[in-house]
Curated annotation (Swiss-Prot):
Protein name (record): Zinc finger protein 740
Domain of life according to the entry: Eukaryota
Signal peptide: none
UniProt-listed SMART domains: ZnF_C2H2
Record organism: Mus musculus
Family listed: Belongs to the krueppel C2H2-type zinc-finger protein family.
Xref: Pfam families: zf-H2C2_2 (PF13465)
Zn finger residue spans: C2H2-type: 88-110, 116-138, 144-166
Polar residues bias locations: 1-11
Intrachain S-S bonds: none
Length: 180
């Protein structure tokens, strides 16, 4: 059940709904009286006075422009997940993202802009990580090694592809090491 569903059910029952920091548990489980989103767990009523300043800061944060709204999904087994909705939409493909940073990075795919340039060969990249990975082509650095056959790779994806195909590698290495 999602937070909005629980909040509307609580409003029907006359409970305190819409509070940014408090959610009453509606499950049939033996829950503590209050559910505190700020600490991602339950707290006792006796803790109210101790956490009053925390509640005030949460109320202030809920009015801030930078506040990220969170959705709490409560499972039937009592576990819960805090999910951040994808509110940033790409105007080119309508892809959804959790932050403006991820949206801006994604839009570079559509615009063709590649702000990161290799100083050796002038290749350009959308992400800094891709440039750093590319630089290993020039340096010859191969930091990723197969533990079965000890072959080295410059990229993790190449090592993972090798590992999928290297099942016979272990038996070859073992036979070679132990054969007389």
């Amino acid at each position: 059940m999602m937070l909005s569903q629980i909040a509307s059910k609580q409003a029907e029952n006359g409970e305190r709904a819409g509070s940014p920091d408090v959610l009453r548990c509606s499950s049939q489980m033996d829950c503590k009286p209050r559910f505190d989103l700020s600490s991602k767990g339950h707290r006792k009523d006796s803790d109210k006075s101790r956490n009053r300043k925390e509640d005030d800061s949460l109320a202030e944060a809920s009015h801030s422009k930078k506040t990220v709204k969170k959705v709490v999904v409560v499972e039937q087994n009592g576990s819960f997940q805090v999910k951040i909705p994808k509110n940033f939409i790409c105007e080119h493909c309508f892809g959804a993202f959790r932050s403006s940073y991820h949206l801006k990075r994604h839009v570079l795919i559509h615009t063709g802009e590649k702000p990161f340039e290799c100083d050796v060969c002038d290749m350009r990249f959308i992400q800094k990580y891709h440039l750093e990975r590319h630089k290993r082509v020039h340096s010859g650095e191969k930091p990723y090694q197969c533990e079965r056959c000890h072959q080295c790779f410059s990229r993790t994806d190449r090592l993972l592809r090798h590992k999928r195909m290297c099942q016979g590698c272990q038996s070859k290495t073992s036979e070679g090491q132990f054969s007389l």
